């Protein structure tokens, strides 16, 4: 998987930088799932969704030993 959010340095807990769930290795969050449903009549606003969707293929992924390989975000 690739790193999104503009940061590509592997941080603590095997995460690739800030704002990036690229390597998918979150040992402290593996079995935790939270769902929140908010119902209302206001229209749903999605700001920046298209930008995040196109950022996916930057070629930054976590390699062996929690290192980013390659790091070219």
Curated annotation (Swiss-Prot):
Coiled-coil ranges (or none): none
This protein's UniProt keywords: Metal-binding, Metal-thiolate cluster
UniProt KW Metal-binding keyword: yes
Highest taxon of source: Eukaryota
Molecular-function GO term, any one: metal ion binding
InterPro entries from the UniProt entry: Metalthion_15p (IPR000347)
Xref: PANTHER family: METALLOTHIONEIN-LIKE PROTEIN 2A, METALLOTHIONEIN-LIKE PROTEIN 4B
Primary role: Metallothioneins have a high content of cysteine residues that bind various heavy metals.
Similarity comment: Belongs to the metallothionein superfamily. Type 15 family.
Stated name of the protein: Metallothionein-like protein type 2
UniProt source species: Solanum lycopersicum (Tomato)
């Amino acid at each position: 998987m690739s790193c999104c959010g503009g940061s590509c340095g592997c941080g603590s807990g095997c995460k690739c930088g800030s704002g990036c769930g690229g390597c998918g290795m979150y040992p402290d969050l593996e079995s935790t799932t939270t769902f929140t449903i908010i119902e209302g009549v206001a229209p749903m606003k999605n700001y920046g969704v298209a930008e995040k969707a196109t950022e996916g293929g930057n070629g930054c992924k976590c390699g062996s030993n929690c290192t980013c390989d390659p790091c070219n975000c």
